[in-house]
Amino acid sequence: MGWQNPPVPWREIERRLSDRPAEADGGDSPAWSRKREPYVAPPSIAAAPPARQHHSSVPYAELHCHSSFSFLDGASHPEELAEEAARLGLEALAITDHDGFYGVVRFAEAARAVGIATVFGAELTVDKLDISPGQADPDGSHLLVLARNPKGYATLARVISEAQLAGEKGAPRFTMSDLDRWASPDELNDWLVLTGCRKGLVPRTLEREGPAAAARALGSLTERFGRDNVAVELWDHGSPLDTVRNDAMVDLAIRAGVEPVATNNVHYANPNARRLASAMAAVRSRRSLDEIEGWLPAMTSAHLRSGDEQARRFARYPGVVERAAELGLACAFDLSLVA
């Protein structure tokens, strides 16, 4: 009779005697692979974290950022985003991929190595009716949710799982009425909801129906999630209409007693990735680059920016950049707390 234990290699014996943490064996992590080595920060960044190469005089955290795990939408790996955030001197970085937490493990590992505080969230697709592939501009509204703490992360993970199970591959089914069944009002207090990009409920209503309807849409969010748990998102990608929209959004925020906050609605780490992002958009829509050109943004703007850059862009809205840093640090926690 024997225990049939496998042989223990000397390196494992040495690790145990040295009291070093165990190396991950993958478990059920979607980010783990025997072919993927543990993340090692570039020497220029790892030399002296949390010091940054680019010292920004204005504190800032990016709260709306898509990685390559937003399939054919984000153009940079989580590690690239964390590294660029460190170079720019950001206080914190949120990864908000579409309808899932697919890249959070890789993001957390890289951010920990480069000294960036981590915020976890997702951009949920609401009321998507047409799930056919190849759309240049897919339908459905977006709800941007950040977890304030590990409890909020667990609630958001459960809601995402329910939506994925209720839908089909690549097309989770999520409505606001579903949210009432999947999460209690107390659990929603552990979320911070941003009004989101142009497909967010409030900006989309503002564009299509005007300020009065947008005010009602914002009121529906504050009624559901609580005024203190909603922030009005401003972004500026250089379009002439961005300032017009931001002026209207700030006015809505003031009237509703909700704080406005700056983001850059990031889809790639730096301007060099813009061409890759355009190619991905063409692949997603099953069009050539010539055919998709009219749908693409005119400016190379959806990349990470420093606090100084954002402060210049949002000079007409004092405090919105600094408020992003405050919210980012308030929502930041290490992913190890979830395990």
What residue spans do the PLM features occupy?
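Phosphodiester-processing cores and adjacent nucleic acid-binding clamps
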Residues: 1-339
